Amino acid sequence: MQIKINSLITPFIDTTPRFSWSLPEGNFASQKAYMLTVATDKAFENTVFSTRAETAERANVRCDIALLPHTKYFVRICAELCGGETVTGETYFCTGFMGGEWDAKYITGGDAKKRDAVLPAVYLRREFAAKKPRRAVLYVVGLGYFEAHINGEKVGDDFLSTPFTAYDKNILYRAFDVTEMLAEGENAIGVILGNGFYNCFTEDPWQTNTAPWRDVPKLMLELHMEYEHGTEKLLSDGTWSYVEGPIRFNGIRHGEEYDANFEKEGWDKPGYTGEEKPARYVRNPGARLSLMEMEPIRVIAKYKPVLCRKTENGYLYELAQNIAGVANITFCGKAGARYTVRYTDRLMEDGEPDHESLACFIRNYCFQTDVYTKKSDAPESFHSIFTYHGFQYIEVTGGDCPELCDIEAWALCNDFEKRAEFACSDETVNKIEHLCHASTVSCCMHTLSADAVREKSSWTGDTGLSAEQLLINYNAENLMRKWQQDLRDSMRPGGCMPCIVPSAGWGYSGDLNGPDWCNPMVDVPWNLYTEYGDLAVLRDNYEALCAHVSYITSMSQGYIAEYGLGDWCAPFDGPAISVNMSAYKCPLAVSDTAFYHSAVKMAEKYARLLGFCADAEKYAALASKVKAAFREKFFDAENCTVYGDCQSATAMMVYHGLANEEEIPQLVETLARIIERDGYHPDFGILGCKAVVETLGRYGRADLVLKMLTNPTYPSMKVWLDMGATTLFECWNGGGSRNQHMFSSVSAFFHKYVAGLSAAAPGYRELEFRPALYTELTYASASVNTPYGKAACGFEKQNGKTTVYLTVPADCTGKLYIGETVREFTAGEYAVEV
């Protein structure tokens, strides 16, 4: 039995614990009851909570336990199965401050009065004597990023701690069990601070350098050492010191400059005798402090270059895969040699690396560039720690070119588990699925950023459109819960949201934050509820959703909304600039009003589930008015066409619930005719992409989607593959970013409507099987590790026979839809000939 608390293994938590557990794979016996016990000792002699419940529930089970701060709790769960068998598991979790006060103070090193972009990274240190503790926990607030060391060893194996938030509203602190890192007697702790997004000095269109939270990097730290009798704390305060270190420059959108001549041997160990200066107290940011309950960023894959060649300025190393991360490079030159390492994901027509196309928004300092200066003639290794880059190509200039074997690229991502698989008989479709995955993991760096190169910011529309496939494919529940808090923190009291979140203050005005780009407040909580079955996510976001609906209503005229970004990045000719990327066919009022209607209908759905009956009736009435206004203004009922006469507009009427049930078959036929007229090419941008593939998949025309995506001529995703894509592109013509996830909603389509597997009830307690047997595919399969176990659906055509393969987890049911026939299944594995 695997037990998770708040969807994590043995976590530190600050919130009400949610318990989830799995039964052994292949055991389809129903759970009759469970016994859950929580104690403060491993022998379960000091029990603080115990309950037995006769239920099959085992996902996000909330228990009202009076938890103490800074405490380790042991958990035992015994699941009683209907056949008489019992399955037992044990685990533990630890609490942080639980909202309590910190005794430590914020400190920094260097000139604490200046927000100077070229200040080196801050190296803080403290030596102390201690007995060997029974348990030791290190709590760190490190702004913007930090890396902690104890006795010369790095604490943890993650990168880019602390997560990006609106630092004036919410700061996420970290907790580490460091018991084994402390020695009896003399010890030392060192912390390196980088700028991150907290002290982001980039002059860019998004006002990052004028963020209301911006300040010098700072540290607040408490080390709690627990002994047999009593505890001891080490706090960040005026007794700390700082040293000058080798990271001379660091910027999240720029890179890192490292001069090994400034290394201070032993600075993070006891007995250091080099020069030190007193640390300084600095201003408390004043935000609430929350424990990071989320998978950290780690190295998830490593790649060696597949090619090395000479360029005009140096040597270029090519990877087989476009990634986001860092390069670990060993330099073999002479002492004093200075190397410049530049990263890009594209080449110019002459084969030289293109370092400028995506640097257009960065108006100061370098872009995607690291610099390393050697201190000796011996080999020296380096990787940046306070930035990451998006790249497939690494250009090294200066000194002696490092050998090919001396470069290794490390892909970084929040280290959540992959929970789903998809494959089919069309290798082009499989490659498109890979593009979706590769782009998604490249952009998961504590938020789902729009891209890994140009901006590293989370555009709300992009994230909202990708969230469903992200949550299907990965256990990214905590990442999206965190981002929902970011959304709530960014919302103004009247319901206005920015189009990038977290935002430094940009994106609240103009035609940037319409119902389309603010839709994540509507859909993402529902995606979380669908995938993981926790009603609390709807409750947490309900007030904000209501405010958002009120704001859209205030911006509408006669229940028609028209103030968003629209169907961004539909096919266009020319460079990837805003005037081209916004040249879409779908009228803005059509898409915005469709999203307005969805927001109101979802508010009604939330209200009914949460028991707010009066609200539900209010939103039902408002939805009827929006629907009536849309139909009157945009729908030609006689010809069954939608204003705009394009794929996106037609699909949106169906997808957003603006069509009556009896009209849907004819609208799907209209959509099919438009696609045929367009030569089986997509004419949609990212809004239309999701609406079109969902509509066609739901109503039995997945074949048209596959034909469009795999069309050998422009525009299509097949053309991206022919252009060498290993990640999704931003624009159909290959312009803009070469690693952007915003078209990745097609992955959810593959799972739900090609292989045919989707959740019909929260947490997959009910499953829906809709395999696309009518396509030319000879097989397709999908599986997902649901909260109740593995679910799967697939089909195989062989020797004139078609067999559908199903897996229904214990305590779940499923319905198989083949044409007009519906068959029901209980838990088990099935092979059904159709």
Describe the predicted segments one by one:
Residues M1-K72, R76-R454, D462, N478-R481, ...:
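Extracellular/oxidizing-compartment recognition motifs
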Residues F146, V155-D157, T162, L487, ...:
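Active/binding-pocket-proximal capping segment
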